[in-house]
A protein has these predicted regions:
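Structural signal for hydrophobic packing residues in well-ordered secondary-structure cores
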Residues: 25-29, 57
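Active-site and donor-binding regions of nucleotide-sugar-utilizing enzymes
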Residues: 4, 8-11, 15-26, 66-123
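Conserved nucleotide-sugar phosphate-binding/catalytic loop shared by glycosyltransferases and other
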Residues: 33-76, 86
Length: 123
């Protein structure tokens, strides 16, 4: 049985670093990859990197509603809550064996906290 891996990416910075590993996992018969995208990838301001992701021809892409917000405390906390809610919905409807996350921003912290709550190992 294939191991189901979710790779979370929210910006060009983490996607660029993980691009090769995403490609390898997606083309390895031992794994079933879901590339979970959100936040800046669909933003014109940040270059709509969603197009670059689509060009990789990843077999399974799931877009979550992580919409970039203004960087003030209240908006960031509302955004953080939205990210947790969206990640919970994803885990409720997808059986995932492990999650790959990379980043030093609050987006990945929200995803990591959700993984911990769902007992999903983080790679």
């Amino acid at each position: 049985m294939k191991k189901k891996i979710a790779v979370f990416t929210v910006a060009r910075s983490d996607f660029g670093i993980m691009k090769n590993i995403i490609h390898r996992i997606d083309n390895d018969d031992r794994f079933e990859l879901t590339c979970v995208i959100g936040a800046a990838h669909d933003s014109k301001i940040f270059g709509q990197t969603i197009n670059e992701i689509k060009e990789m021809k990843i077999k399974k892409i799931k877009k979550l509603k992580f919409n970039y917000v203004k960087s003030d405390s209240k908006n960031i906390m509302n955004y953080f809550q939205m990210m947790i809610d969206e990640t919970c919905k994803f885990f409720d409807t997808n059986k995932i064996d492990a999650a790959l996350i990379l980043g030093d921003r609050y987006e990945m912290m929200a995803i990591a906290l959700t993984c911990i709550n769902y007992n999903i190992p983080i790679m």
